């Protein structure tokens, strides 16, 4: 008995121990002790084996279900398991005499960390798998068929039939198939999402392109407006410059006209004064001079027009035109000489006034000789002309 008490002190609370022989004396006490000792050793070995097997099964199930999806009822079941430990220990502590009755009814208390399990019925274990499988998420309206578990009449009084848990039902395979089907659905959903994302990306790209096009169009419109504005400004500047040039030309023309008028006003009074102050002897000298200049200018203009019109004429006409031109040049040279002599005589007359009548006679003689000089020069010119011809 001392040895049994020591074992009881080391063992956990939920382990079954044989009853004390002192409390139940009888004629068959030795046989009963040996039977109880053998029964306790067998129960401890079977409990350890069952616990190890259940741990392996639970770990495999957890791995498979974690791979497929996380079920919300998993946490609730683990909580129920955690809550079952103190409850079972409390029952074993409060009612030690009911251990034998529990064994008779099929209950079994393990010495490991697992909670107590009913020996005769495994219905608490089977619905756990059903709950973990749950409803198919792809088809939520599909009716769920719960398979009936084994009948409760399998529980025997000997307490050795349902010690080991039942093998995994085909529901686990259905859950695996469900995971594969979910993977297929996820692949379809992934393709749909990828297509939607591609459409969104294309839409965003089109939107960005449209925004860039609008910006470029706005920039082009602004540039066109600036070009138009600059063109208008340049046109205004050109008009102003043209008006200024016209005004400058008009001013120049007016200035030239005014200068010509002033020159005419200055020349005409001098000619009149000279005509009034000069003697009658000088009139035939000055009058033919001005007439000759006018005639020469007129002939020169006609010569220019005739030369332009007769550029493509015959060589005989050109030779006649050259002869006439030489004659006119000689006449101009003789006229210039006469003008020089007249100017010299006029200067001498105003510088040295005549004091004696003899001087006047000499001056008249000189004038007569000068008047005869142009006649002689004209005669000589007339004589030389046929020689040239």
UniProtKB/Swiss-Prot annotation:
Coiled coil regions, renumbered to chain: 211-266
Keyword list, A-Z: Coiled coil
Spans annotated as Disordered: 16-44, 84-115, 301-320, 343-389
Compositionally skewed regions (Polar residues) per UniProt: 35-44, 90-102, 307-317
Claim: ATP-binding is one of the keywords in the record: no
Transmembrane segments: none
InterPro entries in alphabetical order: ZNF_C2HC_dom_1C
Chain intervals with Low complexity compositional bias: 368-382
Homology family: Belongs to the ZC2HC1 family.
PANTHER family in the cross-refs: ZINC FINGER C2HC DOMAIN-CONTAINING PROTEIN 1C
Protein name as it appears in the record: Zinc finger C2HC domain-containing protein 1C homolog
Lineage: Eukaryota, Metazoa, Chordata, Craniata, Vertebrata
């Amino acid at each position: 008995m001392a040895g049994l008490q020591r074992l009881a002190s080391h063992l956990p609370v939920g382990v079954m121990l044989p009853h004390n022989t002192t409390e139940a004396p009888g004629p068959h006490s030795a046989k009963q002790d040996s039977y109880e000792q053998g029964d306790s050793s067998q129960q401890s070995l079977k409990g350890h084996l069952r616990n190890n097997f259940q741990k392996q099964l639970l770990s495999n199930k957890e791995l498979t279900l974690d791979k497929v999806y996380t079920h919300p009822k998993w946490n609730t079941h683990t909580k129920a398991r955690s809550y079952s430990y103190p409850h079972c220990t409390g029952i074993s502590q409060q009612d030690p005499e009911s251990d034998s009755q529990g064994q008779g009814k099929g209950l079994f208390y393990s010495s490991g960390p697992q909670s107590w399990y009913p020996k005769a019925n495994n219905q608490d274990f089977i619905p756990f798998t059903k709950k973990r499988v749950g409803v198919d998420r792809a088809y939520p309206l599909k009716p769920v068929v719960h398979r009936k578990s084994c009948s409760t009449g399998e529980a025997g009084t000997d307490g050795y039939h349902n010690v080991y848990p039942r093998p995994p039902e085909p529901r686990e395979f259905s859950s695996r198939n469900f995971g594969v089907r979910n993977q297929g659905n996820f692949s379809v959903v992934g393709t749909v999402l990828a297509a939607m994302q591609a459409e969104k990306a294309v839409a965003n790209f089109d939107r960005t392109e449209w925004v860039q096009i609008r910006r470029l169009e706005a920039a082009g419109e602004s540039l066109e407006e600036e070009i138009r504005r600059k063109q208008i400004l340049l046109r205004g500047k050109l008009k102003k410059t043209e008006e200024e040039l016209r005004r400058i030309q008009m001013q120049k023309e007016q200035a030239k006209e005014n200068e010509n008028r002033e020159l005419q006003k200055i020349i005409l009074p001098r000619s009149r004064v000279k005509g009034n102050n000069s003697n009658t002897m000088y009139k035939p000298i000055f009058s033919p001079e001005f007439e000759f200049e006018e005639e020469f200018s007129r002939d020169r203009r006609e010569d220019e027009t005739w030369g332009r019109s007769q550029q493509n004429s015959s060589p005989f006409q050109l030779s006649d035109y050259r002869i006439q031109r030489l004659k006119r040049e000689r006449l101009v040279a003789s006229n210039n000489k006469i003008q020089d002599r007249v100017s010299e005589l006029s200067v001498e007359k105003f510088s040295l006034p005549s004091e004696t009548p003899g001087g006047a006679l000499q001056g008249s003689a000189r004038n007569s000789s000068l008047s005869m000089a142009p006649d002689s020069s004209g005669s000589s010119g007339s004589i030389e002309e046929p020689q040239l011809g």
